[in-house]
């Protein structure tokens, strides 16, 4: 059986006492081996994390703030403008109101008109699950996927416990996109142009746009 031999290289700085050139053998670079089970786990475990997150978010609508957001969204679509005065306080109806959530309110109103509360709940689950997976993808590179998933389990428990149909669900998505871009700017600098678009939408959906 023939055996591959490494190619000898000459090191000009390494010489014997007599002045003769010394040859050293350099081992060839070996391809990194990844078992089929490791390849499957690299995609399967994050997929399971996303599935558990999605299913955990499919619970009935409990948050009572949803309804005034929905009514405000209906008002915006009916009048074609964002309210400038308080719509809901009888004793102080002329107080100026800066509606920081109008983008979210229009979104849930459109979803509600198409599929009712059920579609709003599914959309919430999709948005928050996407936020989790994007943030998972953005962080922990170089760690074994099992460790990364294990570290994310407590976070998912907290996120699901707070997974309401509120404007903050969009903040979770936009913040995860910011993280994803930030961790890739050194390799893909053009991604920076995505951030103004994200920020423009975010600033019209939730007050936590200041995190971006």
Predicted segment positions?
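Membrane-interface alpha helices of multi-pass inner-membrane proteins
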Residues: 53, 155-159, 181, 192-207, ...
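Short hydrophobic/aromatic helix or loop-helix immediately within or flanking a transmembrane segment
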Residues: 91-118, 122
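Transmembrane-helix motifs of polytopic, lipid-linked glycan transferases
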Residues: 122-141
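Specific aromatic-rich, kink-prone transmembrane helix
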Residues: 134, 154-158, 170-187
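Short acidic/glycine- and proline-prone juxtamembrane loop motifs at membrane-interface regions
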Residues: 163-170
